[in-house]
Every structure is written in C-alpha cells, then in structure tokens.
Amino acid sequence: MTLGITHLVHANVVCADFDRSFDFYTRVLGARLIGRVFEFDAAADFQAILDVTGSVRCKAALLTWSDDDAATYLDLLCFADERGEPVPRTAKQPGLARLGLRVRDMTATLARIREHDVPVVAGPVTLTPMPGRHRHVLTIRDPDGTMLNLMEFPELGSGRG
C-alpha cells in the first residue's frame, strides 16, 4: 500500500538576504507573490515543522509561477537571530541540492537570464532521459548558490507535465 501522495506541494528555499532573493525569484525568474510577505517568531509559531530553537525571526513569502491553486509553490524563507543576523546553515547539513523549474521557451529564458546578468552554470543542453522525451536544460544559481535547472519539455508543449 502506498501513502497516496499525489504531488509535491512546496519546496522551501532558505536564503541569507530575503530582499535580494525575493527580487531574484520575482523580477528575474518571473514568480509572483501569493498573498503577502510575512514575518513571524519562528520558534514560537512553527518550531516543530521548521526545526528552530531560541529567538529566531523568520521572513517568508510563498511564490508561484501558476494560476492553478494546486500548483507547486516555492516557500522563500530567511531566518535571523535576535541581532537580525542570518541564522547560518552548516555545510554538514544535507539539504536541497537543486530545483527543476519548467519553462515554456528556452530561447526566451536564456535571453532573460542574460538580460539580468545571471551567470550560467551549464547549458542549455539537450538531455534525452528516455526515447521520445527531450529536455532542454539551463542551469543557474540563485543568489545563495542553490542550483536551478530551468527546463523546457518540447514534446509536451506549453502546458503542465
């Protein structure tokens, strides 16, 4: 028996500078804000699910690229201690290695990335993970170094899939 999981709901991206990362994901990558940017006491409000202790403030935003209420969203989080300094993650902590984001048009995507002087890590390259399934992949990094694979799926058209 399976758990009945149907899809990924959201991914958390923890950043060191909220405004810089918010600008990158909205202005450069075209995400839009769901609701509003909010701030809260992470330890008091979400200690169990965020695994934080002590006096830790969190600034957060939910971002999406879709009008579909059931679409996966990005949860952009920035944690700060009582002095307002970012709460660092250690290199020992395993975590998210990269995010894959589907794009409609790789040519337009590459032009936008270049327009905003975002360094390209790799690509675009064409991958064929299985016969008849091609992926054009452009790899960049967000301001904190999280790898992002911007992926075009030509055989699927511009819809979801």
Predicted regions and their residues:
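Vicinal oxygen chelate
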Residues: 1-4, 13, 36, 74, ...
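Histidine- and/or cysteine-centered catalytic micro-motif in compact active-site loops
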Residues: 38-39, 77-81
